[in-house]
Structures are given as structure tokens and as C-alpha cells.
Amino acid sequence: MLNYTKLNLSRMNRLDRKSRLTETTIDQLAKVEQPITWLVITEGWCGDAAQIVPVLNHMALENENITLRFLLRDKNEAVIDAFLTNNARSIPKIIVLDTATREVLNSWGPRPAEVQKMVMDAKAEGLATDDLVLRKQISVNAAEQLHLWYARDKTKAIQNEFLEVASV
């Protein structure tokens, strides 16, 4: 897990330096008038979080009414269990809260829809074989394709999809 965490730190630093919000995103974020909290359930080893968290940070910095907070999934099982994806503790999961009342307004995650489909297809393909070597290769190939997709998308899907549910 430590190797994944180090790799993800590198990814996050790169995205923090290079990712840019779209004008549409900036305009939408400016409309947030009531204080909201984006609670991110994550872990350091999570590759999707490495792609998503820097974008959320940039977005939250655009408006003082948005607070970004983090919970570690494995230390907060009751929270993640209330926000399962396909009966799994998939992360990152972002919960949008009314800051004053702590009412859950919405949630998003663990990844953009197109990437989610890629992950689910790869899981189904891996489960279709009893060959453990092939299953591992499918997993490695899927991870490579996933990060290539994120690089080509340049955070646009994250911005667009999250804004749809982020109460902005």
C-alpha cells in the first residue's frame, strides 16, 4: 500500500500544479451562497482519489462558502457503509452537506461514469476467468487504461459530473 500512496502523492502534486478549472465550473462555484461542506471519504492508496482530490481542492478554493474535509474510509466504516456503491465501500466518495445542519444534500463518487463503466467491465472480465495470472493482467491493464483516461480528460468529467450533484 505504501508504494501506491507514494505514487498517488506524485499524481496529486502534478494535478495540483497542472489542472485548471473550466470557466463554467468557476461560474457555477461562484453561485454557492449557503455554506456547504464536501466530505471526502478516501484513503492514501486510492488511485481514483489521486485524480479527483486535487480537482475538488481547486474547486473548493473558488468559494469561501465551500469547506473541504476528509475522512479515512477504514477508520470510519459506519460513514462509508451509509454511502455504498453497488454494495461496495468504493472510494473516493464525496458527501455534500449543509454546513449548518449537517443534512446530506447529495453524494458523488467513486469516479466519473465513463471510468466507472471501465472498472465494472474489467471486474466482470476478471471474474469470468479462473486463471489468476490472466485475472491479474486484466487488473493491471485496467488500471493503466483508467489513468490514461484521466490524463486525456484533463479533469473535465470530474468537474462536470460533480457540479451536477454538488448543490451549486
Name these PLM-found stretches.
Residues 1-35, 62, 81-88, 103-168:
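Non-globular targeting/processing and membrane-anchoring segments
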Residues 16-19, 31, 47-50, 72-75:
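A short linear-motif detector with a strong N-terminal bias
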Residues 27-58:
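Local sequence-structure signature of Cys/Sec-based thiol-disulfide redox active-site neighborhoods
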Residues 38-43, 56, 64-79, 90, ...:
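Thiol-based oxidoreductase modules, predominantly thioredoxin-like and allied folds used
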